Amino acid sequence: MFSSTYLLAIIALAVSSVFAAGPTAVPLGTAGNYAILASAGVSTVPQSVITGAVGLSPAAATFLTGFSLTMSSTGTFSTSTQVTGQLTAADYGTPTPSILTTAIGDMGTAYVNAATRSGPNFLEIYTGALGGKILPPGLYKWTSPVGASADFTIIGTSTDTWIFQIAGTLGLAAGKKIILAGGAQAKNIVWVVAGAVSIEAGAKFEGVILAKTAVTLKTGSSLNGRILSQTAVALQKATVVQK
């Protein structure tokens, strides 16, 4: 009987030989400079660990909650023991507000770019139940909620791309993970989600989330990629690493 590692190697070879490299990458613009970017608020239940910058606009710094912020001497950014990088908000000193306005605009543009791509390679595949599945490069589209109650694999090379268009909600069950195989990289995986996103306790998520609404990472969960939300991001002792 073949091992799972051997089978994944065979699938990786098939992907590189048969499937296209995936859709054209989504241009994030200056929104890509942030591990977390949101419009309405970013909250944490300490201790969370964020590697990268956190930006908030048009909401003010009072909506950066749970971080115990320390303002810089310039008044243009703050720091937190939970964040490796700067935190900025719309009411900070010049030029921060204009930088954030541009980033928020770029986030909206990226969302539209990803959400309106046509001609999906995979339409309503697995009816949105991704647990146990293997996903090659391509453009995926669902008009319903998408979730995983078991681990699943995203497989492809380091230059391949994925766009997952989701009209409903997105969820990853507690303790489950997305496995990257064949060299696939989180920075090349885009989840464009119209509904709420919930990464349950202890789950491990991979990719860039472009969210129309709220994103929640529950206790002990982690994300490699970025969270770009048009409303709010809530972390509960979670880890976010910008990729």
From Swiss-Prot:
Q: Where in the cell is it found?
A: Secreted
Coiled-coil spans are none
**Per the record, GO CC terms?**
extracellular region
Record bears the keyword Endoplasmic reticulum = no
Give the signal peptide, or none: 1-20
- Provide the pH dependence: Optimum pH is 5.8.
Q: What is the effect of changing residue 40 to T?
A: Has 46% thermal hysteresis (TH) activity of that of the wild-type. Has 25% thermal hysteresis (TH) activity of that of the wild-type
Q: Does the keyword Methyltransferase apply?
A: no
Q: Which InterPro entries match?
A: Ice-bd_prot
Enumerate the UniProt keywords alphabetically.
Antifreeze protein, Secreted, Signal, Stress response
Pfam families documented for this protein: Ice_binding (PF11999)
Primary localization: secreted
Outcome reported for the amino acid change (mutating residue 171 to D): Has 81% thermal hysteresis (TH) activity of that of the wild-type
Q: What induces it?
A: By low temperatures, 0 degrees Celsius.
Give the site residues for Ice-binding.
40, 232
Family indicated by similarity = Belongs to the ice-binding protein family.
Tell me the function of this protein: Binds to the surface of ice crystals. Inhibits growth of the ice crystals. Has antifreeze activity for survival under snow cover. Has high thermal hysteresis (TH) activity, which is the ability to lower the freezing point of an aqueous solution below its melting point, and thus the freezing of the cell fluid can be prevented protecting the organism from ice damage. The TH activity of this protein is 2.0 degrees Celsius at 0.11 mM.
For this entry, the protein name equals: Ice-binding protein K1-A
